[in-house]
Regions:
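Short alpha-helix in the alpha/beta-hydrolase fold that links the catalytic acid
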Residues: 102, 209, 218, 232-241, ...
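Short beta-strand/loop motif that positions the catalytic acidic residue
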Residues: 215-217, 222-224, 228
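Catalytic active-site module of serine/aspartate enzymes centered on a nucleophile-bearing elbow/loop
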Residues: 263-275
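An N-terminal hydrophobic leader/cap segment in hydrolases
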Residues: 18-64
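Membrane-embedded segments
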Residues: 67-147, 151, 169
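Catalytic histidine-centered segment of alpha/beta-hydrolase-like enzymes
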Residues: 255-265
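Acidic catalytic loop of the alpha/beta-hydrolase fold
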Residues: 226-231, 257-259
Length: 275
């Protein structure tokens, strides 16, 4: 009968404890991700800044009441004549004041603007969640729809805001939908970074644009940089394939996630002018 060498028992015991500590560490890491996930998903700048102070004096600040009682800020620039009105949903970081250059570009030709500051961002009450952001979008849509016909309303979603814009366009009539750096779902984006974690099972706010985009009937423009290392363009291409409405995909060579500027607005104006 073979006798095990003492070193073998020690090695197996060490391996056993190594596996146990690895599993405990992994479990603790996953638990921490779950508990803190919204702090990792939303990065609000909470300071309330008047449009004029931010550099957009033609905008009026309005306060909207969401269905669940939160009060959210929006900036409103009325259009000239029969120009379209862009209902703008920003990304997961910053606030409206950091997007003033974009708003100037959008309104330079007389187009109108309603730019929403989500709950927890830039003077709005509450804390961001997917359900909450969609409620905020519905409040902003109601404000806009009360003043302008649906066919003049253009939804513009930026990054995380594409999930909000798609959710709104899937249930309310609009003239056009513009998606800048969109994704199939926020879980798919998260899985790019946390590939070793079951993100789809743990994530609360998934913004499943892939399940909603098929209900959109308005023409859709997708804008994406091919150097985007936050939302890979492959996710936008997958979402694009699910669109049933008239659509166009504009790719920007050498452009990263946060680098789309006036060229995006120019592409959007061309798209809107052809309809």
């Amino acid at each position: 009968m073979a006798v095990k060498a003492p070193w073998y028992d020690r090695a197996m015991n060490t391996l056993k404890w190594l596996v146990i500590f690895t599993l405990l560490g992994y479990g603790a890491f996953v638990a921490l991700l779950y508990v803190t996930q919204r702090a990792l998903q939303y990065f609000p700048e909470r300071i309330r800044t008047a449009p004029a102070v931010a550099g957009l004096p033609e905008a009026e600040e309005v306060v909207l009441d969401a269905a669940d009682g939160e009060r959210v800020i929006a900036w409103h620039v009325p259009p000239r004549g029969d120009k379209p009105v862009v209902l703008y949903f920003h990304g997961n970081g910053g606030s409206l004041r950091g997007r003033v250059d974009r708003f100037r570009d959008l309104t330079a030709d007389g187009s109108g603007l309603v730019a929403l500051s989500y709950r927890g961002y830039g003077g709005s009450s509450g804390a961001p969640t997917e359900v909450g952001l969609v409620n905020d979008a519905l409040a902003a849509y109601a404000f806009t729809r009360a003043r302008y016909p649906a066919e003049r309303i253009v939804l513009w979603g930026e990054s995380l805001g594409t999930g909000v814009a798609v959710a709104l366009a899937a249930q309310q009539p609009v003239g056009h939908l513009i998606l800048q750096s969109p994704f199939t779902s926020a879980a798919d984006v998260g899985a790019q970074r946390y590939w070793f974690v079951p993100v789809g099972l743990l994530m609360k706010d998934q913004f499943r644009s892939d399940l909603r985009i098929g209900k959109v009937t308005a023409p859709v423009l997708v804008l994406h940089g091919d150097r985007d290392n936050i939302v890979p363009m492959a996710l936008a291409e997958r979402l694009y394939g699910l669109i049933n409405a008239p659509k166009r995909f504009v790719r920007f060579p050498g452009i990263g996630h946060n680098d789309l500027g006036a060229e995006a607005v120019e592409a959007a104006k061309q798209f809107l002018g052809e309809r």
